[in-house]
Amino acid sequence: MTLVLLLAATIAFIVLATTRAGLHPFLALLIAAIGFGLLAGMPASDVITAVNVGFGGTIGSIGIVILAGSIIGTFLERSGGALRLAERVLAISGERHVPAAMGIVGWLVSLPVFCDSGFVILSSLNRALAKRAGVTLATGAIALSLGLYATHTMVPPTPGPVAAAGILDADLGRVIGWGLLISAIALLSGWLFAVTVASRVYIDPNEGEPEASQGTDNQDTNGSSPGALHAVTPILVPIALIVLRSVGRLPSMPFGEGGFFGLIDFVGHPVVALLVGVGIAFTLVQDDLRSRLGATGWVGDAIVAAGSIIVITGSGGAFGKVLQGSGIADVIGANLADAHLGMWLPFLIAAGIKTAQGSSTVSIITTAGLMAPLLSTLDLDSETARALVVVSIGAGAMVVSHANDSYFWVVTQLSGMDVRTGVKLQTLGTLVQGTVAATAVWLVSLFVL
């Protein structure tokens, strides 16, 4: 209980330091990580090691992806391609249905693509849509964020659900089937949250981007900007490559284990796939490409814009790693495991661990390990029950995304949100969506178990 209270105080410090005191989130998170570790009784050397490993590991896994995504987004915006693409999406969906379109796109993209990578890839499209429709950036950003999260935590082939299915000996096909159903229900709740709550928070889509990119719209009127199909290729090609890699890694090994599999496994890695997207984005420039590639050109501006996002995301990873090392996840999981809550138990354990240490994947895997020996006792050891337990764990792994979650910082920093707004929208949104998903799992279990 002491660790839980300490965590609550630490989160309050982060929020107050960044909103009231105006401290940069990077410093606030590092201070919080070190302070929590020391007050939790961790050896000082272990605290520093956890900070370094968490910071470096997070940047190592997503730093290049954020940089590449920033470059793609900058070229899309300044070439006029994002505007053309936004016009096309608006023509299909209509201005009133932009949040629904972003949510569905996120739900589909996150089936094979990590939610943070998907948000990086699609955030420039969301910004362009908000600018074109003249609406707040917050609505589409939260709809996209929650849409990505729905499938990321509940539907294979993302690593968390796959690992949980393996630990619990659940049939992967059943997990996919129930996961798709429950995540679709969660998607609907996320969309409703976006249009009823996030829409009340105005975030100017022209803010938070380099000044030079704000003149993008002018390029669209002179006929020099790329068409919508050309503009979407830097987004679709990386996604397609990542999808192929995920398919190739399925247990059935559809591409075999030879040279073709090796090629797909290489080009489908998120880093390589996004770099391919960067190369395609360069083709969006109609004239004077060379001047765009230097330190003072579009590439340089994109790297500068991404730098702040990367260090904040890395410090969020450092905070999460310290929490993992403190043992708070074990404390929460062990206490909840003694309760008798049926299908709600895996959700609550996963939610507690997720809230405590930030990583959805760690939450899913840890909870699956805790639940495995309890399934027979809880009468949840049938094939269908095991699959639903995996989905329930995934629902819990959404609750909640806050300051110790690197995805929280990706969403807030790419969407122009301060910490308080992020808590109001991203954190509360994941609470609503995860709870709705868990309720859906429970209701389904009443009829099929």
Predicted regions and their residues:
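Juxtamembrane and boundary regions of transmembrane helices in multi-pass small-molecule transporters
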Residues: 173-217, 395-449
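Hydrophobic core segments of alpha-helical transmembrane domains in multi-pass membrane transport
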Residues: 6-18, 30-38, 66-71, 105-109, ...
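Hydrophobic transmembrane alpha-helices of multi-pass solute/ion transporters
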Residues: 2-71, 84, 88-92, 241-315, ...
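Juxtamembrane helix-boundary/capping and inter-helix hinge elements in multi-pass membrane proteins
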Residues: 42, 77-82, 92-96, 128-140, ...
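Membrane-interfacial loop-to-helix junctions in multi-pass transporters
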Residues: 1-5, 56-62, 89-104, 132-140, ...
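Alpha-helical transmembrane segments of multi-pass membrane proteins
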Residues: 95-111, 133-153, 171-180, 184, ...
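Long, contiguous bundles of hydrophobic transmembrane helices that form the permeation core
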Residues: 177-297, 449
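Hydrophobic alpha-helical transmembrane segments of multi-pass integral membrane proteins
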Residues: 63-69, 92-125, 310-316, 339-378, ...
